[in-house]
């Protein structure tokens, strides 16, 4: 499925909801979506409160 990236392990996508980047500052955790090998960006804290 994939070759490399933060959401890829042994040529397979990591399952949806796997943290690929820890929260820092005003950013929330970033999670794998189970469909890409890249780590999708998540919104800032408070943006959806």
Swiss-Prot record:
Disulfide bonds join 2-11, 7-32, 8-37, 20-39. Inhibits ADP-induced human platelet aggregation. Its main location: secreted. A motif (Cell attachment site) lies at residues 24-26. SUPFAM superfamilies: Blood coagulation inhibitor (disintegrin). Expressed by the venom gland. Belongs to the venom metalloproteinase (M12B) family. P-II subfamily. P-IIa sub-subfamily. GO terms for cellular component: extracellular region. Residues 1-47 form the Disintegrin domain. This is Disintegrin ocellatin. It comes from Echis ocellatus (Ocellated saw-scaled viper).
